[in-house]
UniProtKB/Swiss-Prot annotation:
This is Large ribosomal subunit protein uL22. CDD domains: Ribosomal_L22. NCBIfam families: rplV_bact. InterPro entries: Ribosomal_uL22, Ribosomal_uL22_bac/chlpt-type, Ribosomal_uL22_bac/org-type, Ribosomal_uL22_CS, Ribosomal_uL22_sf. GO terms for molecular function: rRNA binding; structural constituent of ribosome. It comes from the Bacteria. The lineage of its organism: Bacteria, Pseudomonadati, Pseudomonadota, Gammaproteobacteria, Vibrionales. GO terms for cellular component: cytosolic large ribosomal subunit. It comes from Photobacterium profundum (strain SS9). Belongs to the universal ribosomal protein uL22 family. Gene3D superfamilies: Ribosomal protein L22/L17 (3.90.470.10). GO terms for biological process: translation. Part of the 50S ribosomal subunit.
Amino acid sequence: MEAIAKHRFARISPQKARLVADQLRGKPVAQALEILNFSNKKAAELIKKVLESAIANAEHNEGADIDDLNVAKIFVDEGPTMKRIMPRAKGRADRILKRSSHITVVVADR
């Protein structure tokens, strides 16, 4: 039994979000939530919401017991990049890339 939750177009760089996601892969959901609660990264807050949604999906749609759930898969894919311009001296301009992510969490029983 698997339950999936996604957050698409999350306004965070995939590189930064993967730092948090890699810590959770394969862990029981209780331990994963504990890690996210004590992490002070922006990605932790976003991933925590997705994980809680996946847990709720498993409980509601599949009738799963929360104590038996593990983070089976968690991955962060790159979303679209917004291009912005930062004016610089002497008429120049630098490009700013505002990256976004697609966060996917799959929970399954052990």
